[in-house]
Amino acid sequence: MKLLLLLLLPFICVPSFAQTDPPELSSWMINTTGVTGYNGISANIQKVQYSTGNVYINCTGVPSFTIGPWQANPNTAQDQKYVFRIPRSPKIKTGTKTATRLGHIAVWKNGVPIYNPKDAFSYNSLNVWFQDAVLAEAISFDGCYGHPAPGGRYHTHQNPKCLYTLDSSKHSGVLGYSFDGFPIYGPFGYKNSDGTGGITRMKTSYKLRVISDRTTLAGGTTLQPNQYGPTISTTYPLGFYLEDYEFAQSYGDLDVYNGRFAKTPEYPNGIYAYHVTISSTGKSEFPYIMAANYYGEVAEDNFGPGRVTITEPVSTYTPLTFVTPSIGEVATIFELNQNYPNPFNPSTIISYQLPINSFVSLKIYDVLGKEIKTLVNKNQDAGYYKVDFDGSNLQSGVYIVRIEADKTVQEMKITLIK
């Protein structure tokens, strides 16, 4: 029977029985080790809770990487005790789109809020010619392109330099989620929206206007003299104000919201997604992350202090855990370790180690070869991992754990006794 099972497993595919943690749950950097960030504040995501319709992100707003100092900025990062709500089935907003207002409009996967490009200041306070925060506030950014607002609200307006490593050879990963539920990716994606054509840098469709003065808006609107912007100069160079830019259809790869619908590794059937935009040299390019409006229907209870009240039954998400080895210890072999406890009821820990970076597939099958659940299906760095398998919805019996990485397969039996 075992020989027959081993022969059948590579060819078995029963999608209706397969389950995997969706990216809106698995993408978050959950703090499972007590790591702290600035001033000893607990870093990254504290807890992820979810219902059928929403994911709730509990976070401090402080990352685990080093932040600060902030020149010419009297504020310091503080624990914000955020609870953000991310819709799990995002919907396109029909009619008038919702503006990306001042303050947090989205959240990175480590719990740091995302702000739009707009500075709070406009020329002569007339609500036209708004300063571009990336230029106007640049002196106060730390080495990770972030800074704290009044009240200690640390945030970024642009490419989160310290959150990920740029790699132009592969599709960027999910870096965060917008409050309309659509994911935010790094700057690299498939050349074609159907997933073909190789990898390319996603180019913004915004460009600097060809103007010699600031008397009109993009689209041709003529302003009253009292609404004119300052003369273009070294003090106020072209690009210092948001109105210095215009959207040009098909100028780049992305739409007016700075996103597109396309297949991605996490969403193989396609998803609308925003993209971080940078130049060929890595410099942030307008509108940087998201533009003036959201694409989808927004969970507006995220606005204000950012402490959403949960009014529905929720479960707490248990993530796949990277196991920190002892000092000097490195994974030298590919190995699937025996689960613990075994037998188990209802859950057990499955651990494994990777000697090299690999695409990992970790699945559970019943003894007939039917796929029951997908626990892991993504690229992982070399190291030690453990994942919790919950068999609450399964009958007592023997199940097969199968892991495949770097063209190598290992299997083991586990026993559920209720």
Regions found by a protein language model. Give the residues of each.
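C-terminal tail/sorting-segment detector
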Residues: 388, 392, 396-418
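A glycine-anchored, Pro-Gly-centered beta-turn/N-cap motif
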Residues: 152, 270, 383, 395-398
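Glycine-centered coil/turn sites that cap beta-strands in beta-rich domains
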Residues: 324-340, 344-364, 386-389
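A recurrent domain-boundary module in secreted/ectodomain proteins
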Residues: 111, 278-326
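Extended, compositionally biased non-globular segments
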Residues: 182, 196-301
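Solvent-exposed N-terminal domain segments of exported/luminal and surface proteins
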Residues: 19-135, 142
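Bacterial Sec-dependent N-terminal signal peptides
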Residues: 1-20
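Extracellular-facing segments of soluble proteins and assemblies that are Gly/Ser/Thr-biased and enriched
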Residues: 99-183, 188-191
